[in-house]
Amino acid sequence: MSRRCEICGKGPWTGLQVSHSHRRTKTRWLPNLHKVRALVNGKVKTIKVCTRCLKAGKVQKVV
């Protein structure tokens, strides 16, 4: 399963971490994902959603 938000499609970013001596190493920054039980097309489904979509109210959570 991918580390990607199923609502907005936000996924990992890649880049370089640069130390004080300017050595560079590849790294990945992962989105803040949560597994949420939500209504999708009238059915209850567990999906991965980023915090930004949760706070914006783009997901109808099931209790």
Swiss-Prot record:
SUPFAM superfamilies tied to this protein: L28p-like (SSF143800)
UniProt entry tagged with the keyword Ribosomal protein: yes
The keyword Thylakoid is assigned to this record: no
Keywords: Ribonucleoprotein, Ribosomal protein
Gene3D superfamilies noted in UniProt: Ribosomal protein L28/L24 (2.30.170.40)
Gene Ontology MF, one: structural constituent of ribosome
Pfam short name (any one): Ribosomal_L28
Listed GO biological process terms: translation
InterPro entries for the chain: Bacterial_rp_bL28 (IPR050096), Ribosomal_bL28 (IPR026569), Ribosomal_bL28/bL31-like_sf (IPR034704), Ribosomal_bL28_bact-type (IPR001383), Ribosomal_bL28_sf (IPR037147)
Superkingdom of origin organism: Bacteria
Family per record: Belongs to the bacterial ribosomal protein bL28 family.
Protein's name in the database: Large ribosomal subunit protein bL28
Organism of this sequence: Dictyoglomus turgidum (strain DSM 6724 / Z-1310)
